[in-house]
Curated annotation (Swiss-Prot):
Protein name according to UniProt: 4-hydroxy-3-methylbut-2-enyl diphosphate reductase
Binding site for (2E)-4-hydroxy-3-methylbut-2-enyl diphosphate: H40, H72, H122, T160, S216, N218, S260
Catalytic activity of the protein: isopentenyl diphosphate + 2 oxidized [2Fe-2S]-[ferredoxin] + H2O = (2E)-4-hydroxy-3-methylbut-2-enyl diphosphate + 2 reduced [2Fe-2S]-[ferredoxin] + 2 H(+); dimethylallyl diphosphate + 2 oxidized [2Fe-2S]-[ferredoxin] + H2O = (2E)-4-hydroxy-3-methylbut-2-enyl diphosphate + 2 reduced [2Fe-2S]-[ferredoxin] + 2 H(+)
Active site positions: E124
Cofactor(s) listed in the protein's UniProt record: [4Fe-4S] cluster
Cofactor remark from the record: Binds 1 [4Fe-4S] cluster per subunit.
Annotated positions binding isopentenyl diphosphate: H40, H72, H122, S216, N218, S260
Sites where the protein binds dimethylallyl diphosphate: H40, H72, H122, S216, N218, S260
Length: 282
């Protein structure tokens, strides 16, 4: 059984930067916390906890110490509260997320109604929305955007893990909703590249394994685009979840991983699949 690993599997720039900031802070000791999980990887969060860095839902209970802003960013009021309390702030917000926050703030201040394309329950989107000073709407698809009310000036940004195709559908729906529309490119390039690579790989293999946190938006999207092409797509968080039955009759297996998946987990999955392949060949 041949195994093909996607070239872009694993940490993206923003996640690599965030984890580096967090682990460096953990190594220095002291009262250090992250505002929410630093990234959507339970294994990384657990490692940080073992080093004394725990994730907090908010800064309400903090009076001193260091707070690390997660890669998904934070709501503006949480940041203001951290500043008011004079906490040491380490901002690990992904630069692409930061750009989306700034666009929303500027659009709102310029009189635009803002449309954010993404998952309303995702912390990144909740943070982005908090920078709006006027009307702001969150839509997950073009179908939802069709239901938006008429507006004057519209500004559109997207959650960084969205697909360009979904963004286009929303923009098309918004074109008839207002007299002026401004669209900003806030989708992470790494996200787009990984999704295209996953599609290509899925078309070349008999089975796909997508590695990453079940709460990771970009990993779930990788699994979705892969499954559209290769129905035998399996989303796992760790090697122990692999089922040898998945590989019955499989000659080529493709592997990709979300932007928040650590290399050591990818290596463990590779090793386990190689072991399954050896057992099949006996």
């Amino acid at each position: 059984m041949k195994i093909i690993l996607a070239k872009q599997a694993g940490f993206c720039f923003g996640v690599k930067r965030a984890t580096q900031i967090a682990f460096e802070a953990a190594g220095k000791g002291g009262k250090t916390f992250t505002l929410g999980p630093i990234i959507h990887s339970p294994q990384v969060v657990q490692k940080l906890e073992e080093m004394g860095v725990k994730a907090l839902e908010n800064v309400a209970g903090m009076d001193e110490g260091t707070i690390i802003i997660r890669s998904h960013g934070a709501a503006s009021d949480e940041l203001e509260e951290a500043v008011r309390k004079q906490l040491d702030i380490l901002d690990a917000t992904c630069p692409f997320v930061k750009k989306a926050q700034e666009h929303v703030k500027n659009l709102s201040n310029s009189g635009y109604d803002v449309v954010v394309v993404g998952d309303a329950d995702h912390p990144e989107v909740q943070g982005i929305v908090s920078y709006a000073t006027g009307k702001v709407y969150v839509v997950a698809s073009g179908e939802e955007a069709v239901k938006l009310p008429k507006m004057g000036k519209i500004g559109v940004v997207a959650q960084t893990t969205q697909s360009f195709e979904n963004l286009r559908h929303v923009v098309d729906a918004c074109l008839v909703k207002g007299g002026e529309i401004r669209v900003f490119h806030t989708i992470c390039d790494a996200t787009a590249v990984r999704q295209e690579e996953a599609k290509k790989l899925a078309s070349q293999v008999d089975c796909m394994v997508v590695i990453g946190g079940y709460n990771s938006a970009n990993t779930k999207r990788l699994a979705e685009v892969s499954a559209e092409i290769q129905p035998r797509t399996h989303h796992i968080e760790m090697a122990q979840q692999l089922d040898p039955a998945w590989f019955e009759g499989v000659k080529i297996v493709g592997i990709t991983a979300g932007a928040s998946t650590p290399k050591w987990i990818i290596d463990e999955v590779l090793e386990q699949i190689e072991s399954i392949a050896k057992d099949k060949n006996r």
